A protein has these predicted regions:
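Generic beta-strand/beta-sheet core signal
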Residues: 4-6, 36-38, 51
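Active-site-proximal structural scaffolding
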Residues: 26-30, 41
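Short acidic/polar inter-strand loop motif in beta-rich domains
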Residues: 7-13, 38-46
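Low-complexity, Pro/Ser/Thr- and charge-rich linker/hinge segments at domain boundaries
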Residues: 45-81
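Mature extracytoplasmic or organellar-lumen-exposed domains after removal of signal/transit peptides
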Residues: 32, 48, 79-192
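Glycine-centered tight-turn motifs at strand-turn-strand junctions
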Residues: 1-26
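Generic recognition of flexible, low-complexity loop/linker segments
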Residues: 21-24, 34-38
Length: 192
């Protein structure tokens, strides 16, 4: 077993095209850690330390602040990925239902399905650039919230320092927009 000292990465949706890439897990901050090894009914716990890069004058508190911020951004990115998966599932359920009923579907139900599809598509398009089918498409179409969150993550993870004020402000704005979109999706799924 080898640990690369990184936290687990964010969830991802296969096939998505992102300009800024997917969000990986941040590297653990310097400090004291324990590893527990198990084999059958035997186990042993071993302590170890992660040391900061001596080329930087970064304090352990600064490293902790960076890691905590990166975990927050990673978790918000994961929420977006889960929402995109949920949208695909809802869309598939609507398609399956429509196919089962076929031509006999009452007009009122067909209109409701169309309305829900339009609503979830609007949320999906705010979360992800759905027109991006290749790496170059993101040059032609604006990036959306998932890609913007990945950009903030990348900026804040560069170097061994606390996140900049700009990164924190950008994240706060993006998190508010993301939460609004996720709230819309939740309302659509639960009420419609």
């Amino acid at each position: 077993f080898t640990w690369d000292m990184n936290y687990p990465p964010a969830d991802r949706v296969e096939g998505l095209i992102l300009w800024n890439g997917f969000v990986r897990g941040p590297k653990a901050a310097p400090g004291e850690y324990f590893a527990k090894f198990k084999s059958g009914s035997d186990s042993v716990e071993v302590g170890f330390a992660i040391l900061g890069d001596p080329n930087y004058k970064t304090t352990n508190a600064d490293y902790e602040e960076q890691v905590n911020f990166l975990l927050t951004v990673r978790d918000k990115f994961t929420e977006v990925m889960k929402a995109l998966k949920n949208i695909k599932e809802v869309r598939q359920q609507l398609t399956d239902f429509n196919a089962r009923i076929g031509k006999d579907i009452p007009n009122e139900i067909k209109l409701k399905i169309d309305t829900i599809n339009k609503q979830i598509t609007a949320v999906e398009e705010s979360l992800h650039q759905t027109k991006a089918k290749s790496g170059q498409d993101v040059l032609n179409y604006p990036i959306r919230l998932d890609d913007k969150l990945a950009s903030v993550y990348n900026a804040a993870s560069a170097g061994n320092t606390t996140p900049s004020r700009q990164a924190k402000e950008a994240y706060a704005e993006l998190a508010a927009q993301t939460d609004a979109a996720l709230t819309k999706l939740k309302k659509i799924v639960e009420e419609d």
